[in-house]
Structure formats: structure tokens, C-alpha cells
């Protein structure tokens, strides 16, 4: 199985999107065409490198996100929200899963995209737009959203059907590669912060407003799904679902009794999601194997750890009561790196490799 449908990507991105937005889309033509050819070449690459000549199933991108978020849970049925930058063309899916069948209720297509919105503001704040969204989420806790929230409410608005739409005049990602924001965005929020500039109160407040607007859209989608499906449970998938702050606040709204989010909920989990979709939705197998633990990575014993410490000439001491000493250090506002047991899967710290 593979986590992208090459034919659908070519149809939606290269033919439909580029054609619909011509001539503005010309700068994206090479990028989208290269990606399309890469995806179309996946089958040959798999067969050549692995000597594999059986069937290869190409799973729609968001079906793979939905599959890992639902089929690893122990829910028999659930509402599902899948949000990322974009798959073949879709950026957000609101769905329900019953009897191992996925029913899509609503979709949002690129360039309207919560993922691209968050990426763009991450870039504006001086961080890597592809990998540093978590830093912006963390930064938001230090800011006050009140000054900028109305600006973000103008940038991304709510639709009555549980979806949203963006004012794309603030952005350039839909027209050019590696160009995220427009002059209108800069005239609204001021100059972009470079990565070596000090983070000021303004940057914290903008991060807080972005985070708040994301949460408002989360609540909007959650309320819609609850009303439409009356499900007790919700599953979250896609890279935006790594926003643990928004996830926690959505749970607190009590639209749903419980929420399941797989640790590798971004594209890193699609190698699990695609075969899960094929197993349950194509082959129609019914036996479920719920997710038991995120701690599936490597672990190292004391001898191995000590050997590494000595190799790098690090100072160390053995503690008689590591929990008490850690509590004291934390109470004194120290930063702790916590390392125990097997490493968790996924990009978020879940207790065994944490700061």
C-alpha cells in the first residue's frame, strides 16, 4: 500500500488546480508536476527495488489518516476529523466511521487549509514552516490573543456546514513555492521576524491569536460533527492534530466522551494508515487490534547509557531518589530532560523522552 493516489493527485493538483488558477499558478507548475511524476513513479520504484510483483494499492491520502486514527482506537464507531496541509487536494475531512465504513460528510480543498495557515504564520514568526509548528504552539502560551484575534477571524472564516474558508489575499503559498505570505499579510501584522531576531511580545501575541483561531475552528467542526452524527467518540488525524493544546481544549468542550489521537498522526503514520485502510475497507476484515502503547522505540540499559556518557566525557552522578531530586529541580525552575524506557513513536514527547 502507498499513502497517496497518484492519478487523483495529477488530476486535482496538476490539471484542475493549475488550470483553474492560470496564470497565477504558473510558478507552481514545475513543483506540482515534479511531485506528480514522483508519485507516478512509485510503483516502478517499489517493484525494482524490492522485486515485488504483486498488487500495490494506492490509498487516498486522507483515507490513510482516517484509518490510523480510527482503526487503532478501540471505538466501534466514531466521528473523525482529519486535517493537514493537503493530500491529493483535500486539506480537511469531516467523516464518520461505522461498521468499518468511512462516510465523508464534508471536505475542504487546498488552498483553503488550516495546515497551510499555521505553516504560513510559523514562517512569518521566523521559524521553519515545515517542522516548527510545535514551537509556535508552545510560544502561544506566552501571548495574549486579544489584540490580533479579530484579524485572524477575518483571514479564516466559518461556514455553516462545519467547514471554513480563507481570505487568500493574505497568502502566496497557493501561487508560488516557498513564498508563504503576501504584502497584505505584512501590512496587517508588520515585518516578518528573521530567525536570529529576538522574540518580542508582539510575536507571542500573534502566535496566541493564531492558536486561538485554530481552537475556534476545532470547536466549530466538533460541534457540527456532534450534531450531525450524535457520536460519543471522536478520532483526530492529520498533521494539524499534533496540536495537543487544541486537542485538549476540544476534549474539555465535552462534545464527545473521549477522543483518540494516534501518536504518529501526521504523515509519519501513513505507512500504518494505508495498510489499515486496505485491510478493513478494501479486504473487509473485521478483527481489530487496538493500539496498546506508544512506547515502541529502542531502549538502552544502564551500561549502554554509561558507556555513551563516558564516550562524550559528560559529568554524571547516580541518584538515590531520582523522583524527589527531579521534583526539587523543577520547583527551582530548572529545565529537565527526562529519559526512561522505550522511546515513544511520533513527534510528540509522551513521557519517555521529554523536556
Outline where the language-model segments fall.
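Short acidic/glycine-rich loops and adjacent helix/strand connectors
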Residues: 1-355
Amino acid at each position: 500500500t502507498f499513502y497517496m493516489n497518484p492519478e487523483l493527485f495529477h488530476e486535482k493538483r496538476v490539471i484542475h488546480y493549475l488550470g483553474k488558477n492560470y496564470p497565477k499558478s504558473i510558478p507552481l507548475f514545475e513543483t506540482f508536476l515534479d511531485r506528480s511524476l514522483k508519485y507516478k513513479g512509485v510503483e516502478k520504484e517499489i517493484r525494482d527495488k524490492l522485486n515485488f510483483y504483486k498488487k500495490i494499492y494506492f490509498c487516498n491520502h486522507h483515507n490513510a489518516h482516517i484509518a490510523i486514527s480510527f482503526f487503532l482506537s478501540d471505538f466501534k464507531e466514531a466521528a473523525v476529523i482529519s486535517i493537514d496541509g493537503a493530500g491529493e487536494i483535500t486539506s480537511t475531512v469531516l467523516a464518520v466511521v461505522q461498521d468499518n465504513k468511512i462516510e465523508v460528510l464534508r471536505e475542504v480543498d487546498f488552498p483553503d487549509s488550516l495546515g497551510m495557515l499555521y505553516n504560513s504564520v510559523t514562517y512569518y514568526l521566523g521559524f521553519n514552516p515545515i517542522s516548527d509548528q510545535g514551537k509556535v504552539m508552545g510560544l502561544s502560551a506566552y501571548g495574549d490573543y486579544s489584540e490580533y484575534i479579530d484579524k485572524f477571524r477575518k483571514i479564516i472564516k466559518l461556514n455553516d456546514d462545519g467547514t471554513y474558508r480563507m481570505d487568500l489575499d493574505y497568502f502566496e503559498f497557493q501561487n508560488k513555492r516557498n513564498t508563504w505570505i503576501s504584502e497584505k499579510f505584512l501590512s496587517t501584522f508588520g515585518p516578518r521576524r528573521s530567525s536570529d531576531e529576538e522574540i518580542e511580545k508582539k510575536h507571542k501575541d500573534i502566535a496566541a491569536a493564531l492558536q486561538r483561531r485554530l481552537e475556534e475552528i476545532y470547536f466549530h467542526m466538533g460541534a457540527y460533527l456532534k450534531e450531525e452524527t450524535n457520536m460519543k467518540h471522536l478520532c483526530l488525524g492529520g498533521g494539524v492534530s499534533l496540536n495537543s493544546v487544541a486537542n485538549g481544549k476540544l476534549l474539555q468542550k465535552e462534545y464527545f466522551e473521549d477522543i483518540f489521537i494516534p501518536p504518529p498522526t501526521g504523515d509519519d503514520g501513513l505507512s500504518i494508515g494505508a495498510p489499515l485502510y486496505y485491510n478493513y475497507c478494501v479486504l473487509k476484515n473485521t478483527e481489530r487490534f487496538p493500539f496498546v502503547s506508544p512506547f515502541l522505540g529502542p531502549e538502552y540499559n544502564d551500561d549502554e547509557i554509561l558507556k555513551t556518557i563516558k564516550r562524550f566525557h559528560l559529568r554524571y552522578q547516580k541518584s538515590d531518589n531520582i523522583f524527589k531530586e527531579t521534583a526539587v529541580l523543577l520547583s527551582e525552575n530548572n529545565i529537565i530532560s527526562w529519559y526512561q524506557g522505550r522511546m515513544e513513536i511520533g513527534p510528540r514527547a509522551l513521557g519517555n523522552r521529554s523536556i
